[in-house]
Amino acid sequence: MKGLKKKRRIQIITLAFVALAGSTALIGYAMRDGINFFRSPTQVVEAPPSETEVFRIGGLVEKGSLVRGQGETVTFRVTDTNATVPVRFTGVLPDLFAEDAGMVGTGRLVDGVFQASEILAKHDETYMPKEVVDALKEQGVFQHTEDQPQG
């Protein structure tokens, strides 16, 4: 009788381990496209990611760089004042998207041009995405104002 209980306990533990491993594998598989790493323009220029890697880039839209092309295609440059990366986006830009304003884009770097699939802009004068603030602070160009929340 004791041998049967021990055998049953081992079977339950083994089954629980297999279920846990399967659940972990399914969660990892489901999240593989949902994790995008943030990079500043300086990081992109210094160590360009592969063309298949989806990542986020953030900084300020360089003054005088915004060019509206055919249809919904827009090109501009994003900078952290140390490096600049050209960006190409086809779609509708957020209403508050403007030159010399903060932005975060999601996409891939293809032939030195960031091909954005999504562009986000700061929603008012006091908000800037935390990743952009951190990158600009690291470059020494971020100026904190009284009414600006700290990330």
Swiss-Prot record:
Q: Which GO terms describe its molecular function?
A: heme binding; metal ion binding
- Keywords noted in UniProt: Cell inner membrane, Cell membrane, Cytochrome c-type biogenesis, Heme, Iron, Membrane, Metal-binding, Signal-anchor, Transmembrane, Transmembrane helix
Name of the protein this chain belongs to: Cytochrome c-type biogenesis protein CcmE
Which chain regions cross the lipid bilayer?
10-30
Say which species the protein is native to.
Answer: Cereibacter sphaeroides (strain ATCC 17025 / ATH 2.4.3) (Rhodobacter sphaeroides)
Taken from the record's topology, the Cytoplasmic segments are 1-9
Record keyword Transmembrane helix present: yes
InterPro entries in UniProt: CcmE, CcmE-like_sf, NA-bd_OB-fold
Q: Does the keyword Protein biosynthesis apply?
A: no
* Subcellular localization: Cell inner membrane
Point out the gene that encodes the protein. Answer: ccmE
Q: Where does heme bind?
A: 123, 127
What processes in GO biological process is this protein linked to?
A: cytochrome complex assembly
